Each structure stands twice: as structure tokens, then as C-alpha cells.
């Protein structure tokens, strides 16, 4: 009997995968340790956050998330692995394919650089892993990206400077956002 595991089941990509395929097990950051040592036949790891602006705002915290992802994968010890990554690991994705090497990383933002580091660690630990580099996404359940921002009037997060500017002009803005642990102001209820 085949056993497959989805990590990142509550995120955009993971949630869509879960909606289309019945995995033997699915988990996310709060319950991933229950999967340690299970050695599934296949692990689809979609558990890396895709909030580019947060990664670039705090590169070290984002790299710590990549280290934790590597450790999670090692502890799960799957026989086969699919890592969901990002095309942002390429400085210039024009004409590139998923297996295109990331040659020039100079000037690459932390988001891409840190995901590239995770890809390299995965290659060290699981040489036969399939790494899928997704482009900008759009669809049901998306909570961020350029296209989402175009049709969503109220932003889910504000930088501190923008919050201060808007809150000074509007009591509604002042009461609608709360300072989050990541230093951004988050829209209440999101």
C-alpha cells in the first residue's frame, strides 16, 4: 500500500493539492512533528511560506524557516520527495525551465536566495528529489501577490510607515489593524 504525505496543507498550494488528491496524511506547521519518522513513500513539501515581502524584510528569520524545513524533511525521512519551490530562485526567469540552474545569484532578494539554499540542501539530502519551481500564482484561496492586491481594496498587511500615515488620517484604519510579531500591521480578522 502506498503512503503519501502532504506538508503545508493549509497554505494556498497545499490546500489546492489537498482539494484535488486524497493524501494518506496531511499536516502543517503546528502538527508536523507527528510525521517525524513516518518514512512515507512520497512527501510533497509545500510548507515553505510564500510571503515574499516578509522574507525580504527579515532575511535571517526567513533563512531560519528554510533550515527548519530542511530539518522537517530529514526527520520525516520520505522515500521520495517533491519540494514546491519558486521561480524566484532565478535572477532572470525569462527563457528558463524548472531545471534551469540558478547561475547568477548576485542581487537576488532574500526570498529567492533562501529558497535556492533550501533547494541545494534538498539536493544534498535527497539527490533524486523533484523540485517544482512555481511562478506567480492566482486562484481560489490566494491571500497575497500582485494580482490579488489589484482586486483587493483593503490590504491584509501594512508596513509601519504606511500604517502611521493612514492611521493619522483615519480612526477606522487605526482600529482595523494590529501590530503583528513580524513588525507589520495586520488587518484584524485575516
What positions do the PLM features span?
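Conserved glycine-rich Rossmann-like NAD(P)H-binding loop of the short-chain dehydrogenase/reductase
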Residues: 22-33, 38
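N-terminal Rossmann NAD(P)H-binding glycine-rich loop of SDR-like oxidoreductase domains
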Residues: 2-23
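Short, well-ordered alpha-helices that flank and scaffold nucleotide-derived cofactor binding pockets
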Residues: 19-23, 71-74, 120-124, 152
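Active-site beta-alpha turn of Rossmann-fold NAD(P)-dependent dehydrogenases/reductases
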Residues: 47, 82-86, 133-135
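NAD(P)-dependent short-chain dehydrogenase/reductase
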Residues: 124-190
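Short glycine/proline- and charge-enriched loop/turn segments
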Residues: 96-105
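Active-site Tyr-X1-5-Lys
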Residues: 106-130, 135
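NAD(P)H-binding glycine-rich loop region in Rossmannoid oxidoreductase-like domains
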Residues: 33-78, 87-96
Amino acid at each position: 500500500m502506498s503512503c503519501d504525505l502532504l506538508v503545508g496543507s493549509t497554505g494556498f498550494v497545499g490546500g489546492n493539492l489537498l482539494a484535488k488528491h486524497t493524501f494518506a496524511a496531511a499536516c502543517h506547521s503546528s502538527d508536523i512533528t507527528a510525521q517525524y519518522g513516518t518514512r512515507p513513500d512520497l512527501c510533497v513539501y509545500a510548507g515553505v511560506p510564500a510571503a515574499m515581502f516578509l522574507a525580504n524584510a527579515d532575511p535571517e528569520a526567513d533563512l531560519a524557516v528554510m533550515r527548519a524545513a530542511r530539518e522537517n524533511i530529514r526527520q520525516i525521512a520520505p522515500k521520495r520527495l517533491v519540494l514546491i519551490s519558486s521561480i524566484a530562485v532565478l535572477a532572470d526567469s525569462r527563457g528558463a525551465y524548472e531545471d534551469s540552474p540558478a547561475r547568477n545569484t548576485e542581487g537576488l532578494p532574500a526570498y529567492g536566495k533562501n529558497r535556492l539554499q533550501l533547494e541545494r540542501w534538498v539536493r544534498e539530502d535527497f539527490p533524486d528529489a523533484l523540485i517544482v519551481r512555481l511562478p506567480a500564482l492566482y486562484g481560489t484561496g490566494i491571500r497575497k501577490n500582485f494580482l490579488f492586491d489589484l482586486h483587493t481594496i483593503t490590504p491584509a498587511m501594512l508596513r509601519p510607515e504606511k500604517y502611521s500615515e493612514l492611521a493619522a488620517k483615519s480612526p477606522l484604519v487605526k482600529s482595523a489593524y494590529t501590530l503583528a510579531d513580524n513588525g507589520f500591521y495586520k488587518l484584524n480578522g485575516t
